[in-house]
From Swiss-Prot:
It comes from Thermotoga maritima (strain ATCC 43589 / DSM 3109 / JCM 10099 / NBRC 100826 / MSB8). Pfam families: CheB_methylest, Response_reg. Keywords: Chemotaxis, Cytoplasm, Hydrolase, Phosphoprotein. This is Protein-glutamate methylesterase/protein-glutamine glutaminase. CDD domains: CheB_like, REC_CheB-like. Belongs to the CheB family. Phosphorylated by CheA. Phosphorylation of the N-terminal regulatory domain activates the methylesterase activity. GO terms for molecular function: phosphorelay response regulator activity; protein-glutamate methylesterase activity; protein-glutamine glutaminase activity. The modification 4-aspartylphosphate is found at D58.
Length: 344
């Protein structure tokens, strides 16, 4: 964390929204708005001219939309960008695209009277601006070329892979899921901290680039190899064994580590069923979600992989697992597919 004031550029085509955001940000002693842009073209110019620490970027704007502006900014003046998205299906899809193209994080605009409801998400926005300062913008540019791997002798492994991720997760998942072969012999469960709707867009996006079938997990669905299951937003994702098969269940119990879905919840349930055949992968993200789950996996003799700092947008969740001594392997995201193939 820095002692100096965080300089923020606010990009939004609505003059009213620009003032709401300015009021929220300027109310804090450790941050201030240093400029505004009303469209994507102006955003690129101001990013180069003002060199802000953080940019809040509206998605839907005239002349150049948020995603196009983001791509240009990451090329010309790499900066930490937080997308401000609508809670629509289209908004979710564009947000996932933005996260793949270098945005650090996003917040969702609530429905209803803008000024009142936006103030409800003010604490989240301020927290994400502060968190963004832990990110090196150069990390966001890293895009290794990875070719899809093959398995010559696929076997029924009886194993399961559970991947947990938060801030920066879509980028790291992009280096892992699309590079696994169609005959990967273990089901993969992904718990990514995201609101409802966004997890569906994430699944659709990964499915379009992967040989494995990527989908949101459904209540009562059987867990099978050949699939990557994404935990739906706002539900914990559990697993239960029944008549020799394993099924998912969705759980609305209290948040764990202040999140739902929680990685710990899914790892706990998976480890109880799959025991030593559980492989946990803890990717980029703030906080410690996944650490207790990793302990459970180790308790039953399973394997834990933590993402290396090199490819993490936020080195928090993996760092916690490494510091507790639970990580068997510490690897950059692009080397994880190879290790998973070796382990299954």
């Amino acid at each position: 964390m820095t002692d100096r004031v965080i300089r923020v550029l606010v990009v939004d085509d609505s003059a009213f929204m620009r003032m709401v955001l300015k009021d929220i940000i300027d109310s804090q002693p450790d941050m201030k708005v240093v400029g505004f842009a009303k469209d994507g073209l102006e955003a690129v110019e101001k990013a180069i001219e003002l060199k802000p620490d953080v940019i809040t970027m509206d998605i839907e704007m005239p002349n150049l939309n948020g995603i196009e502006a983001l791509k240009l900014i990451m090329k010309k003046a790499p900066t930490r960008v937080i997308m401000v998205s609508s809670l629509t299906e289209e908004g979710a899809a564009i947000t996932i695209e933005a996260l793949r193209n270098g945005a650090v994080d996003f917040i969702t605009k609530p429905h209803g009277s803008i000024s009142l409801t936006f103030r409800q998400v003010a604490p989240e926005l301020l927290e994400k601006i502060r968190q963004a300062m832990n990110v090196d913008p150069r990390t966001l540019l890293f895009k290794p070329k990875v070719s899809r791997l093959t398995i010559t002798k696929p076997a029924v492994s009886g194993k399961i892979v559970v991947i947990g991720s938060s801030t920066g997760g879509p980028r790291s998942l992009d280096m892992i899921i699309p590079n696994l072969p169609k005959n990967f012999p273990a089901p993969i469960v992904v718990v990514q901290h995201m609101p409802p709707g966004f997890t569906k867009s994430l699944a659709m996006r990964l499915d379009s680039t992967s040989e494995l079938t990527v989908k949101e997990a459904e209540d009562g669905e059987e867990v099978k190899p050949g699939f990557v299951y994404i935990a739906p937003g706002d539900f914990h994702l559990g697993l239960k064994a029944q008549n020799g098969k394993v099924f998912f269940f969705l759980d609305k119990s209290d948040k764990i580590n202040n999140v739902r879905p929680a990685v710990d919840f899914t790892l706990d349930k998976a480890a109880e069923i799959y025991k030593s055949k559980t492989i946990a992968v803890i990717l980029t993200g703030m906080g410690k979600d996944g650490t207790k789950g990793a302990f459970k996996v180790k308790f039953y003799g399973g394997t834990v992989i933590a993402e290396d700092k090199e490819t993490c947008v936020v080195f928090g969740m993996p760092k916690s697992v490494i510091e507790e001594g639970y990580a068997d392997y510490v690897l950059p995201a692009y080397k994880i597919p190879e290790k998973l193939i070796e382990l299954v």
